Design a protein with these regions (language model features):
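C-terminal binding/interaction regions
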Residues: 101-181
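DPxDG-like acidic metal-binding loop motif
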Residues: 78-87
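Acidic-glycine-rich active-site phosphate/pyrophosphate-binding loop
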Residues: 5-16, 43-62, 114-121
């Protein structure tokens, strides 16, 4: 690959990661999903995964608020790990070998910690209350962005599968409420 092609590829990857983050922030706010639910939905739909949106949400529900309110691992990080597993996990066609995937999963953890200085929901929320930490929305955006970056580093061909229509769409709380009332969601 030439230097110019490499630069274009990097710009494309950066744009996809940015769109993933924006869509995660939008869905977190508009649909009222928790962090883990949002990350799984956005990565799955953004990269045209094979889970239905409903199943993607259900998979993330137990990780909300640091494992069901326990305050342990941040749901955004847990959701990102699940999302990476959907595309890279070893027990699927085309998945990575277990040891290779473990390195990617650890890298997700390490990048999240480097960006937000912690991985524990309780610690992250305490920092937020002290006014020097990220909001849950910011953690959700960050978790989705890091997962997308890692996914594209491992499987760059996924850039061609990205659902730009889904990633570019924007919803509002009012629109989401109207869909629920009309039975369209």
């Amino acid at each position: 690959m030439s230097w110019v092609e490499n630069m274009k590829n990097q710009e494309n990857i950066s744009r996809i990661v940015e769109l993933i983050g924006q869509r995660a922030g939008n869905i977190f706010t508009a649909r009222g999903y928790c962090c883990s639910e949002t990350v799984i939905v956005v990565i799955n739909q953004g990269f045209r995964g094979d889970l239905s949106p409903e199943l993607a949400v259900r998979l993330g529900s137990g990780f909300c608020h640091g494992m069901g309110g326990a305050g342990c691992i941040c749901g955004s990080l847990a959701g990102a790990e699940v999302a990476l597993s959907l595309f890279l996990g070893p027990r699927q066609h085309g998945g990575m070998k277990s040891k290779e995937f473990e390195k990617v999963a650890k890298e997700m953890h390490d990048r999240f910690r480097a960006r937000f200085s912690a991985t524990c929901c309780r610690v992250l929320l305490k920092r937020r209350k002290e006014k020097n930490g990220a909001t849950c929305k910011e953690l959700t955006v960050g978790g989705a962005e890091i997962a997308a970056q890692l996914l594209l580093e491992q499987r760059p061909e996924l850039a061609a599968k990205v659902d730009l229509e889904f990633l570019g769409a924007r919803e509002s709380k009012l629109g989401t409420l109207a869909k629920k009332l009309l039975g369209r969601e």
